[in-house]
UniProtKB/Swiss-Prot annotation:
PANTHER family the UniProt entry points to: ATP SYNTHASE PROTEIN 8 (PTHR39937:SF1)
Membership in a protein family: Belongs to the ATPase protein 8 family.
Spans annotated as Disordered: 35-55
Protein name in the entry: ATP synthase protein 8
GO biological process: proton motive force-driven ATP synthesis
Membrane topology according to the record: Single-pass membrane protein
Cell location: Mitochondrion membrane
Originating species: Xenopus laevis
Taxonomic path: Eukaryota, Metazoa, Chordata, Craniata, Vertebrata
Amino acid sequence: MPQLNPGPWFLILIFSWLVLLTFIPPKVLKHKAFNEPTTQTTEKSKPNPWNWPWT
């Protein structure tokens, strides 16, 4: 029964996982912190009044 012989496919399985775990995580981690949150000030700014020229 050839499906019980791990010789032909086991090396391919190990090599594909090695390639996957070597190249994919750095590409994913590069885009992980794309939008870092910024700190906001606690003091409220006073809004400027609008100038309504048509009233």
